Curated annotation (Swiss-Prot):
Protein name: Threonine--tRNA ligase
UniProt xrefs under PROSITE patterns: AA_TRNA_LIGASE_II (PS50862), TGS (PS51880)
Catalyzed chemical reaction(s): tRNA(Thr) + L-threonine + ATP = L-threonyl-tRNA(Thr) + AMP + diphosphate + H(+)
Location of the protein in the cell: Cytoplasm
Disulfide bridge positions per record: none
Organism (species): Hydrogenovibrio crunogenus (strain DSM 25203 / XCL-2) (Thiomicrospira crunogena)
Key words, A-Z: Aminoacyl-tRNA synthetase, ATP-binding, Cytoplasm, Ligase, Metal-binding, Nucleotide-binding, Protein biosynthesis, RNA-binding, tRNA-binding, Zinc
Alphabetical GO biological process terms: threonyl-tRNA aminoacylation
Length: 642
């Protein structure tokens, strides 16, 4: 007689074992119709799964993140179903969930075209409208192998053979189509109402370039058609803001196959990058950080001690010389501990805040590289704070304040916070993880911050707080992190110590923190957020002074020199072109201010000022212009309430 406890604390007793769906039906027909699955004692279960003993149950609908995830996964199966009907010879590989949607990797002779995508999507919609039931069968290993061998699904066979310890597999029956998955999935295809296939890309089987190149069909899926419509509208806007296109048209940077995943910064892009870096450098000064620099390449033994070699070696670039193995650093923390360890610190010296604009390299798969957003070489605005356990809360709170102030200065005021706990693959003892997680979560609560819990998503060495900013078209970007680390400073790792008040050696707590994350990625976010129309303080070129005729050139150059002495980034346009042409060209380059000099301006010692939006601000003397620009720049990117 299982007793089911619901999230509101209410209990329901049943005579016999009961399915998740039967519990939903017992509560109400409306809830049963909306129920996709359930969390039974924290574990996701099918709506058809039996509950045989007392349990806590959360019913999952499309209003829940879990529900969206399940629906999107089922949409991948629906894609597989449609593909096999249209292309019976296609071989199905894997079809997981990704952000906002799903994909399926397939091996087939035909090259899928945009027109083919429309036909595949049409077939998916036809199948979904039938609301056919999805049936799961736990199938013995031998039978599962036989099923996929008979269907000539070579990739499914390989997956089964690579899991020798599994005795049975979940096979999902979609009418005549069978797929393999851990699940759960929707009870019937009526839950899939709003989706769209977006594009096709190439992908190596299992991400290994030695394997066959497959076709990967991507799609997005949402709970209802309005959400899908809003998302597609956002994507249209994002296409116009693509930092790769703007990077080219604004002459900021380029990427090249000569160096996959690594940016070539042009003068204007380098200026923008430097402005961002120098802003962060000033924050270091104001918040009592000490800036350091550590080697790019360090001995393998350091990475073995730190735990990176065991957990991260597949993503590390390595080299060898004089019979010694080295790794190009993927992270800065081990190097920072070497700097900390160079001197023996007292508890009176703590906290010690070490910061670095550290260039790191990670061997990301070529298929995942994307402009500045996903790269192999990037600079982290990285810092590590060595402190006592008693100082954790104050230091974490200071980091949180720095995050929010920094994002506000760059024009972001919608920040989401997530708290990630211990992953399965980790270093350190559970009692140490308990301390670390409790310390971070308590600081969040004391700061009255709303946050989402992400179980199992922490770093291998400690739990973390993640900060995600929402841009002007509603996209969410994960940037800042604060991570608590009780492990890497321990004797069996990198053995950082300080002398405590008891005159004994103790291991400090290490707080990893990054505000922007990757500078390259953050610049890419800024380009898309502002569509290249940067606030004046960020703009690579803040002003252009255009002469109307050659006779005005000397005056223009002198005016520009004076502006440069006041720290402004200014260019002179002395070309023998019509002034209207010059204005249009610099407007397309998103320059905040265009100054025009003709006979009247030269005679009066002024310039005519046009703002980026096209507004003619009139004539300004040099002093008036300096006052106006200084006020503009002082606002940084902060959003001014009207």
């Amino acid at each position: 007689m299982p007793i089911i406890t619901l999230p509101d604390g209410s209990k329901r007793a049943f005579e016999d074992a009961v399915t998740v769906m039967q519990v939903a039906s017992d509560i109400g027909a409306g809830l049963a119709k909306a129920t996709i699955a359930g969390r039974v004692n924290g574990q996701l279960k099918e709506a058809s799964d039996l509950i045989t003993e007392d349990a806590e149950l959360q019913l999952i609908t499309l209003k829940d993140e879990d529900g969206l995830h399940i629906m999107r996964h089922s949409c991948a199966h629906l894609l597989g179903h449609a593909l096999k009907q249209l292309y019976p010879a296609a071989k199905m590989a894997i079809g997981p969930v990704v952000e906002n949607g799903f994909y399926y990797d397939i091996d087939m002779e035909e090259k899928i075209t945009p027109e083919d995508l429309k036909q595949i999507e049409k077939r998916m919609k036809e199948l979904a409208k039938t609301k056919y039931e999805v049936i799961k069968e736990m199938t013995p290993r031998a039978e599962a192998l036989a099923t996929f061998k008979e269907r000539q699904e070579d990739y499914k066979v390989e997956l089964i053979e690579d899991m020798p310890d599994e005795t049975e597999f979940g096979l999902y029956h979609h009418q005549e189509y069978i797929d393999m998955c851990r699940g759960p999935h929707v009870p019937n295809m009526g839950f899939i109402k709003a989706f769209k296939l977006t594009h096709v890309a190439g992908a190596y089987w299992r991400g290994n370039s030695d394997n066959k190149m497959l076709q990967r069909i991507y799609g997005v899926a949402f709970a209802d058609k309005q959400e899908l419509k809003d998302y597609l509208r956002m994507m249209e806007e994002a296409e116009k803001r693509d930092h790769r296109k703007l990077g080219k048209s604004l002459d900021l940077f380029h990427v090249d196959e000569l160096a996959p995943g690594m940016a070539f910064w042009h003068p204007k892009g380098s200026t923008l990058y430097r402005v961002v870096e120098n802003y962060m450098r000033q924050q270091l000064v104001e918040n009592d950080y000490q800036e350091i620099r550590t080697p790019l390449i360090m001995d393998r033994t350091l990475w073995e001690k730190s735990g990176h070699w065991d957990k991260f070696k597949d993503n590390m670039f390595t080299t060898e010389t004089e019979n010694r193995d080295y790794a190009v650093k993927p992270m800065n923390c081990p190097g920072h501990i070497q700097v900390y360890n160079h001197n023996l610190s007292s508890y009176r010296d703590l906290p010690i805040r070490l910061a670095e604009f550290g260039l790191v390299h990670r061997n990301e798969p070529s298929g995942t590289l994307h402009g500045l957003m996903r790269v192999r070489s990037f600079t982290q605005d990285d810092a590590h704070i060595f402190c006592t356990p008693e100082q954790i809360k104050e230091e974490v709170q200071a980091c949180i304040d720095l995050v929010f102030n920094t994002y506000a200065d760059f024009g972001f005021d919608n920040i989401q916070v997530k708290f990630s706990t211990r992953p399965e693959q980790r270093v350190g003892e559970d009692d140490v993880w308990d301390l670390a997680e409790e310390a971070l979560e308590q600081t969040l609560k004391d700061a009255n911050l709303e946050y989402a819990l992400q179980p199992g998503e922490g770093a291998f060495y400690g739990p973390k707080i993640e900060f995600q900013l929402k841009d002007c078209i509603g996209r969410v970007w994960q940037c800042g992190t604060i991570q608590l680390d009780f492990s890497m400073t321990q004797e069996e790792r990198l053995n950082a110590v300080y002398i405590g008040a008891d005159n004994e050696k103790h291991h400090p707590v290490m707080i990893h923190r990054a505000i922007l994350g990757s500078l390259e990625r953050f610049v890419g976010i800024l380009v898309e957020h502002y569509e290249g129309k940067f606030p004046t303080w960020l703009a690579p070129t803040q002003l252009v002074i255009a002469s109307i005729a050659d006779v005005h050139n000397e005056y223009v150059n002198d005016f520009a020199k004076k502006l440069k002495k006041h720290g402004f980034r200014v260019e002179s346009d002395l070309r023998n072109e019509k002034v209207g042409f010059k204005i249009r060209e610099h407007t397309l380059q998103r320059v905040p201010y265009i100054l025009v000099v003709g006979d009247q301006e030269m005679e009066n010692g002024t310039v005519n000022v046009r703002a980026r939006g096209g507004e003619n601000l009139g004539s300004f003397s040099f002093e008036e212009l300096i006052d106006h620009l200084s006020e503009d720049v002082s606002r940084l990117g902060r959003i001014v309430e009207s």
